[in-house]
Amino acid sequence: MENVTFVSNSHQRPAADNLQKLKSLLTNTRQQIKSQTQQVTIKNLYVSSFTLVCFRSGKLTISNNHDTIYCDEPGMLVLKKEQVVNVTLEEVNGHMDFDILEIPTQRLGALYALIPNEQQTKMAVPTEKAQKIFYTPDFPARREVFEHLKTAFSCTKDTSKGCSNCNNKSCIENEELIPYFLLFLLTAFLRLPESYEIILSSAQITLKERVYNIISSSPSRQWKLTDVADHIFMSTSTLKRKLAEEGTSFSDIYLSARMNQAAKLLRIGNHNVNAVALKCGYDSTSYFIQCFKKYFKTTPSTFIKMANH
């Protein structure tokens, strides 16, 4: 019988142990990176007003049916009103910082009036060819002017009588300067061929916008087509027909207004989901969450976590 020598593999264990430790280290590293970088995508966000987004940190991708803009450096996004966009927000090292400013229609009219007539004619581009999402790089004093306008729009009335919610004299004194502040913010944007047509079209109030504004003025109310028709002194049949001519319907606008209001309240961070549901006309919180998720493709809790940055 031949001698058989059994060789122990004990000398291979350190190598196996090191490999296991390496796998564990890589797993932990991936988990740490994942915990530091959170991402959420919000779909079907209706842009009801000419909107500026002050982007400070993180990563942001915004798109519609034709345009896609990717941001990973500080700057400002310009969004034409009455479009539907998808937004992806991503933290970088745990940080995501941005702010939103919706420009009232009448303010755009005042801004457009500052542009020389020959420049308006020269730079006008047909609506169907115009881009609807733009990015402009950061520049000195942009953030300060952005913050000033945000304060002014939240404090002042639509007229030039000054501030209605506080005693801040600067709100009253700077009322007439608001169009010039806007002009300063949009300097880079106004160099683009499409800019003047976009400002002009956004300064005009469509029937869709009128209906949207009526519903948004009281989102908790259970609106009906007849209610809105009475507000604008129009028959229900005429209202339906004219909205169809603009490519929309009362039910679509109603849902957009309620969901946008919900997103706005959740982004501010002063309301919990139950309160937001009630403020947007939903008696059932669970049904509201269901509608929110179906509309935006994300849950209210996930939206709050990212948007509150």
UniProtKB/Swiss-Prot annotation:
Disruption phenotype: Decreases invasion of host cells.
GO molecular function, one term: sequence-specific DNA binding
Domain HTH araC/xylS-type residue range list: 209-306
InterPro entries attached to this UniProt entry: Homeodomain-like_sf (IPR009057), HTH_AraC (IPR018060), HTH_AraC-typ_CS (IPR018062), Tscrpt_reg_AraC-type_HTH (IPR020449)
DNA-binding region (UniProt annotation): 226-247, 273-296
Function: Activates the expression of genes on pathogenicity island 1 (SPI1) that encode virulence proteins involved in invasion of host cells.
PANTHER family noted in UniProt: ARAC-FAMILY TRANSCRIPTIONAL REGULATOR, HTH-TYPE TRANSCRIPTIONAL REGULATOR APPY-RELATED
Name recorded for this polypeptide: Transcriptional regulator HilD
Gene: hilD
